[in-house]
């Protein structure tokens, strides 16, 4: 009997089972223990293969692929700390709902806890963060193939959102020519190999329940809060709110067009808060809200009913309002709860939104971080997409810009970490094949610097804007101790990214004014390659501009 040959047949069943559940993208890191899985994936023509040498980046690459494709994405890594490097992407997927299938190769049980090389306790290592966990036994012909395939099918059928961790121990030898070992075992699955359906088909449908009293609530004074959703849903939500005559507070990830722009500015005005207090119902569609003032208002508002609609399970309401948590796809829920044409009930908020926008426009000529956030709409590629980093940059865009309705916007706003942002953006581009603008801060770029290797393989123009404000300037917005701020919070690195771009053979520009930036962008959008554009800005201007605008708008 050939152990290596049977390992590969066992792995082939696993990988083929994944294809029956919509898996098309497989992300693979190098490793020896994962050889059976890697070869099975490489030999399966149903897969698009992606490779990366860094498992942390690989997990985020898969996350980006899943965001756009809306399909589960598989990840294959070897044993040991390679598995642990998937933790950040797994956590993010659990909070934002992307489906990741993590296939982690492992040593067999007799090599665990005995000093064997590259052997750690992998089973259950991700604690409660995966939505589903499956620890497979060592491959053996004593276990029928139908058990293996039905076990995979069952786990995937139960996966509504988040990650499925499948731990796969393999004994040596891992290499060798294929022979007939296990062929009969494999053939007992019959014509399943030629079919396209799962071996075990389980029905688990996410159904939207109609709120029978909606006809009553839609006649009341309401507020719509729009969080993370798809571009198509964003346009529908904007129209729905407009028909109802309800003010729409749109997050940067809502893709609603933010009809009342600069919400995180005007929500700091007491007149706006007073008017919003008249709302009898708040309907929040989508989660992961960004703006600080929005979150503060959400925490203190007390409508008669607060509804949260999202296809991700869980409460999703840190303020713990009295109301309803409705698990449904936003588009489906809107269809079941049509709007009734009514006149807008808010008067003060549209006025404040317009005045806030005028204050922002008045500062757009200065070459700086806040002004870039405001101008970002002008720099979006036609029929493209935007990826927004975390920390200060996403807050500035949320507060100061107005993105087009229905324009795709992506970000990692679940755990909101700065790790893996470039890798995620690379996955977003690969899954869509669209022109992509990504914008991150300098520390975020440093954190995921080796992901620049992924940007050598893009299928359309890709522009990475690195806003270099020399450190974590978001801490300038927080009451951090002045004497300790620079060393322990901001951590300026005093670096530039020209050498990093050159190392990976990427185009690079460092514009010093808006005309130079626009010229660099014009050239980048004509080239199906990646371009790094570094904006070196005054360290504190972005945070200070936001604070100044907040003060101005609060007194309107």
From Swiss-Prot:
Q: Which SUPFAM superfamilies match?
A: Thiamin diphosphate-binding fold (THDP-binding)
Q: Which UniProt keywords apply?
A: Magnesium, Manganese, Menaquinone biosynthesis, Metal-binding, Thiamine pyrophosphate, Transferase
Catalysis: reaction(s): isochorismate + 2-oxoglutarate + H(+) = 5-enolpyruvoyl-6-hydroxy-2-succinyl-cyclohex-3-ene-1-carboxylate + CO2
KW Metal-binding (keyword) present: yes
Q: Which Pfam families match?
A: TPP_enzyme_C, TPP_enzyme_M_2, TPP_enzyme_N
Biological or metabolic pathway of the protein: Quinol/quinone metabolism; 1,4-dihydroxy-2-naphthoate biosynthesis; 1,4-dihydroxy-2-naphthoate from chorismate: step 2/7; Quinol/quinone metabolism; menaquinone biosynthesis
Asked whether the UniProt record includes Magnesium among its keywords, one would answer yes
Q: Which domain of life is it from?
A: Bacteria
Enzyme Commission code: 2.2.1.9
GO MF, one example: manganese ion binding
- What's noted on cofactor binding? Binds 1 thiamine pyrophosphate per subunit.
Name the GO terms of the biological process aspect.
menaquinone biosynthetic process
Cofactor(s) required for function per UniProt: Mg(2+); Mn(2+); thiamine diphosphate
What does the subunit comment say?
Homodimer.
General function of this protein: Catalyzes the thiamine diphosphate-dependent decarboxylation of 2-oxoglutarate and the subsequent addition of the resulting succinic semialdehyde-thiamine pyrophosphate anion to isochorismate to yield 2-succinyl-5-enolpyruvyl-6-hydroxy-3-cyclohexene-1-carboxylate (SEPHCHC).
UniProt lists the family membership as follows:
Belongs to the TPP enzyme family. MenD subfamily.
Cross-referenced PANTHER family, in alphabetical order?
2-SUCCINYL-5-ENOLPYRUVYL-6-HYDROXY-3-CYCLOHEXENE-1-CARBOXYLATE SYNTHASE, PROTEIN PHYLLO, CHLOROPLASTIC
What name goes with this protein?
2-succinyl-5-enolpyruvyl-6-hydroxy-3-cyclohexene-1-carboxylate synthase
């Amino acid at each position: 009997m050939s152990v290596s040959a049977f390992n590969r047949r066992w792995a082939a069943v696993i990988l083929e089972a994944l294809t029956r559940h919509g898996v098309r993208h497989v992300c693979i890191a190098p490793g020896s223990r994962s050889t059976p899985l890697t070869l099975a994936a490489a030999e399966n023509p149903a897969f698009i293969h992606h490779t990366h040498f860094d498992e942390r980046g690989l997990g985020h690459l898969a996350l980006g692929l899943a965001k756009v494709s809306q399909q589960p994405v598989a990840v294959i890594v070897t044993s040991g700390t390679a598995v642990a490097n998937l933790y950040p992407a797994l956590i993010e997927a659990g909070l934002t709902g992307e489906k990741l299938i993590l296939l982690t190769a492992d040593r067999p049980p007799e090599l665990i806890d005995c000093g064997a090389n590259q052997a750690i306790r992998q089973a259950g290592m991700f604690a409660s963060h995966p939505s589903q966990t499956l620890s497979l036994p060592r491959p053996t012909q004593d276990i029928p193939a139908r058990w293996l395939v039905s076990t995979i099918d069952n786990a995937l059928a139960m996966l509504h959102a988040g990650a499925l961790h499948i731990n796969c121990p393999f004994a040596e030898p891992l290499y060798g020519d294929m022979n007939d070992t296990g062929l009969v075992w494999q053939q007992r699955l019959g014509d399943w190999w030629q079919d396209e359906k799962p071996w075990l088909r389980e029905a688990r449908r996410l159904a939207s329940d109609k709120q029978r009293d909606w006809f009553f609530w839609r006649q009341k004074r309401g507020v719509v809060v729009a969080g993370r959703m798809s571009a198509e849903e964003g346009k529908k939500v904007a129209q729905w709110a407009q028909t109802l005559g309800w003010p729409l507070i749109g997050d940067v990830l809502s893709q609603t067009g933010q009809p009342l722009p600069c919400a995180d500015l005007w929500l700091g005005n007491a007149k706006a808060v007073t008017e919003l207090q008249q709302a009898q119902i708040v309907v929040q569609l989508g989660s992961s809200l960004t703006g600080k003032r929005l979150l503060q208002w959400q925490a203190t508002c007390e409508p008669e009913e607060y509804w949260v609609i999202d296809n991700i399970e869980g409460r999703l309401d840190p303020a713990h309002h009295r109301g309803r948590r409705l698990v449904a796809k936003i588009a489906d829920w809107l269809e079941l709860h049509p709007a009734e044409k009514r006149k807008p009930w808010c008067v003060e908020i549209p006025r404040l939104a317009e005045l806030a926008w005028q204050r922002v426009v008045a500062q757009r000529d200065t070459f700086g971080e806040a002004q870039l956030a405001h101008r970002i709409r002008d720099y979006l590629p036609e029929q493209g997409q935007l990826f927004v980093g975390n920390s200060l940059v996403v807050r500035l865009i949320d507060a100061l810009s107005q993105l087009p309705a229905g324009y795709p916007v992506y970000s990692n706003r679940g755990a909101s970490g700065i790790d893996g942002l470039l890798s995620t953006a690379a996955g977003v581009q690969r899954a869509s094949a669209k022109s992509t603008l990504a914008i991150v801060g300098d520390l975020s770029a440093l954190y995921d610097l080796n992901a620049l290797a992924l940007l050598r393989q893009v299928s359309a123009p890709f522009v990475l804007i690195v806003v270099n404000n020399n450190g974590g300037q978001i801490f300038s917005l927080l009451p951090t101790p002045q004497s300790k701020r620079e060393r322990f919070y901001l951590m300026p690195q005093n670096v530039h990214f020209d050498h990093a771009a050159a190392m990976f053979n990427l185009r690079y520009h460092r514009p010093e004014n808006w005309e130079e930036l626009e010229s660099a962008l014009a050239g980048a959008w004509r080239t199906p390659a990646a371009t790094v554009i570094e904006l070196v800005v005054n360290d504190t201007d972005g945070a200070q501009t936001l604070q100044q605008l907040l003060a101005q708008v609060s007194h309107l």
